[in-house]
């Protein structure tokens, strides 16, 4: 009986968690306070930077569906937990 109850609780938890969208920081610039709820299917947060930008002014953060290949002098970091791209 306890096993059945535990199984039902686990199924309910997985169902509830799977329906939530990812939340990522979304902004341009060094300091980022704005949070964005990502669209369905966008399960990654990213931080895109220009290499050699000393002050971090060319930094973009947001949500992504897939990983892109960085161009020359670019660095893109991806993560898959809420608010991980700070």
UniProtKB/Swiss-Prot annotation:
Domain of life of the native organism: Eukaryota
**Where does the signal sequence lie?**
1-19
Name the InterPro entries on file: Snake_3FTx, Snake_toxin-like_sf, Toxin_cobra-type
Question: Keywords assigned by UniProt?
Answer: Disulfide bond, Secreted, Signal, Toxin
Tell me where it resides. Answer: Secreted
State whether keyword Disulfide bond applies: yes
Q: Which cysteines are joined by disulfide bonds?
A: 24-45, 38-63, 79-84
The record's GO molecular-function terms, alphabetically, read: toxin activity
Q: Which residues cross the membrane?
A: none
Q: How would you summarize where this protein is expressed among tissues?
A: Expressed by the venom gland.
- Protein family according to the UniProt entry: Belongs to the three-finger toxin family. Ancestral subfamily.
Protein name, per record: Toxin 3FTx-Thr5
